[in-house]
Amino acid sequence: MKKVTAMLFSMAVGLNAVSMAAKAKASEEQETDVLLIGGGIMSATLGTYLRELEPEWSMTMVERLEGVAQESSNGWNNAGTGHSALMELNYTPQNADGSISIEKAVAINEAFQISRQFWAHQVERGVLRTPRSFINTVPHMSFVWGEDNVNFLRARYAALQQSSLFRGMRYSEDHAQIKEWAPLVMEGRDPQQKVAATRTEIGTDVNYGEITRQLIASLQKKSNFSLQLSSEVRALKRNDDNTWTVTVADLKNGTAQNIRAKFVFIGAGGAALKLLQESGIPEAKDYAGFPVGGQFLVSENPDVVNHHLAKVYGKASVGAPPMSVPHIDTRVLDGKRVVLFGPFATFSTKFLKNGSLWDLMSSTTTSNVMPMMHVGLDNFDLVKYLVSQVMLSEEDRFEALKEYYPQAKKEDWRLWQAGQRVQIIKRDADKGGVLRLGTEVVSDQQGTIAALLGASPGASTAAPIMLNLLEKVFGDRVSSPQWQATLKAIVPSYGRKLNGDVAATERELQYTSEVLGLKYDKPQAADSTPKPQLKPQPVQKEVADIAL
């Protein structure tokens, strides 16, 4: 009897092994032209570009969570700002001679115009529907107090008038005028306090999660697109023919499959660094990451929400990094208006909100540990700021809110944990390691795999970032007449700058506003607000900001 039992057991094991081998073989035979790792706005945007450029290419998207747009792209996990430098003061640093540098602001604004054109084109194609579900006009304002800050904002306003991209901006130091623009900010404020504000009517609030869901829903209508949820990438291996075999685990049933892809895009947010390292490409050795989270105070009280229609950004305190810039924002989430204030930085070793506490440790290697240490030593202000933020009490956060909303009541607000952002640290020959501003596309020399690292300015520039990726990875195709024609249909201003061309700027803003249902009035001539004589400033090194 024991022999029979043993025989049956051996047969069962053998049959199971044969079955597993058959499944493995079947999975190895699954092929796709493009594998998109991550179900966020970056993968959705790249997939949408490629659907128009090469409609016959097969695409597979894998997402670890049970739905798309549940991490950083989720509307509640970011500030929903259409970053265009209309109000973000850290994009216009003050030079040592006191002058204002606008180069970064112009670049950020140019990038957002590409996003607007991309979204407008998708609305016209029927890919994106009901623009008000994902983008709404919300004026963008800068607000400061104190003589030095007022002088800075006045000079910033004057400097930005050199650009055609900022012609609609208005400036005021009048309490009554600013109260009309942002009642919550001014009511209860000391009437003798010296304040100033700028306001641009064409600012936007954007629900990047909704854009992501709609783009992916459109991709799913094609038979050569596959979406696999609850699917986690466990391994990436380059094949001899420069294709990639990617092992994907089904988190629901515990099985694994192999996907053979000609091109792999790692758009997994905070998880992108670890997957890039897993690929083994030499370019990955130059990078490390440092996670920073964010919290917001949220109010859904109609008395608060209906009294505020603007995104109001302030100025970082002296000695604080740009990421500390507070803002009080109108948001449109889940079909209703709310007001958010923050962000307050938090620290966790997770690279994703739904990540692992081991993320930071597991991404630390012999290649990047020294650059990380150098960055910590060279950016002590940042370290000090993060420590101070982690130590904030409920009362501390409320006092910070009252600087922007003097009559705020505690009972109207609750604390919300937003998403995680991973700041790029790159090895540097001179400094050992440096914090990299913005986002960075990292690819292999063969152009078979690419990853997006970084956090700022984030989702608002998904369209230009993915356009940059196309140029970097598919350079020969991008230069072809076919791709050139298609790209110019998607982004009418592709290949040229709007800055300095008033007619082109107004034409594109008018077009995108009409299609997206946004407010746009032709700008009037700028006022003659005098530029102050600013004091010379000490040279300040750049510090990475967080796009929350």
Curated annotation (Swiss-Prot):
- A Gene Ontology molecular function term of the record: 2-hydroxyglutarate dehydrogenase activity
Q: Which cystines does this chain contain?
A: none
Q: Which Pfam families match?
A: Mqo
**Disordered: where is this region?**
521-548
> Which superkingdom?
Bacteria
Q: What class of enzyme is it?
A: oxidoreductase
Q: Which UniProt keywords apply?
A: FAD, Flavoprotein, Oxidoreductase, Tricarboxylic acid cycle
Biased composition of type Low complexity is found at 530-541
Q: Which cofactor does it need?
A: FAD
Q: What's the EC number here?
A: 1.1.5.4
Amino-acid biosynthesis as a keyword of this entry, yes or no, is no
Q: What chemistry does it catalyse, as a reaction equation?
A: (S)-malate + a quinone = a quinol + oxaloacetate
What pathway is this protein said to act in by its record?
Carbohydrate metabolism; tricarboxylic acid cycle; oxaloacetate from (S)-malate (quinone route): step 1/1
Q: Which family does it belong to?
A: Belongs to the MQO family.
**Protein's recorded name:** Probable malate:quinone oxidoreductase
Record the organism. Escherichia coli O1:K1 / APEC
